[in-house]
């Protein structure tokens, strides 16, 4: 169920619309459109949902500025670092106020400092907007920013960490 709707019972058209309107995505490869500027990449989600208006354009710029990209919003992806590109992808995932944000290895190509900045910002924005977020990562250090950890091994759920102390012990390398 998503927002009270049975996703399995939906038609393909309904599922596509639901994904486009209610789910934000960011992946290991940021999948930015190379010939669109940072702000145009973010606005793309609103354009696809036919919701790009003046307020949406302002929100795109505010979100990029909040992510430290005010000076880069008119740059093409190839003119930005990996961390900057990933922050553009985060802005794009959040611009349409989705109910759920999925992040698949969002820090895989980043150095530790940049990875922390990206995940901390991402988690902060998700909490601030009162959204649900799911992050897939092999980097246990990134679990510092989450509320719950589901540990998988060989495709099976082996443990759920829910308490802050339990999660921080996992982050510090106590168990994994």
Predicted feature locations:
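ABC family nucleotide-binding domain
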Residues: 1-145, 149-152
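Conserved beta-strand-loop-alpha-helix hinge in the C-terminal portion
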Residues: 156-176
């Amino acid at each position: 169920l998503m927002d009270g709707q049975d996703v399995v019972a939906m038609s393909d058209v309904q599922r596509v619309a639901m994904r486009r309107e209610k789910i934000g995505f960011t992946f290991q490869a940021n999948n930015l459109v190379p010939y669109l500027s940072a702000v145009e990449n973010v606005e793309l989600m609103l354009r696809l949902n036919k919701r790009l208006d003046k307020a949406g354009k302002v929100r795109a710029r505010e979100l990029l500025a909040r992510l430290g990209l005010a000076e880069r919003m008119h740059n093409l992806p190839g003119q930005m670092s990996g961390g900057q590109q990933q922050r553009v992808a985060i802005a794009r995932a959040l611009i349409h106020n989705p109910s759920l944000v999925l992040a698949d290895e969002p820090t895989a190509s980043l150095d530790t400092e940049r990875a922390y900045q990206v995940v901390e910002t991402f988690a902060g924005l998700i909490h601030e907007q009162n959204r649900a977020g799911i992050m897939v990562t092999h980097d246990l250090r990134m679990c510092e920013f989450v509320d719950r950890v589901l540990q998988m091994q060989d495709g099976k759920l082996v443990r759920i960490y829910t308490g802050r102390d339990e999660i921080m012990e996992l982050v510090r390398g106590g168990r994994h």
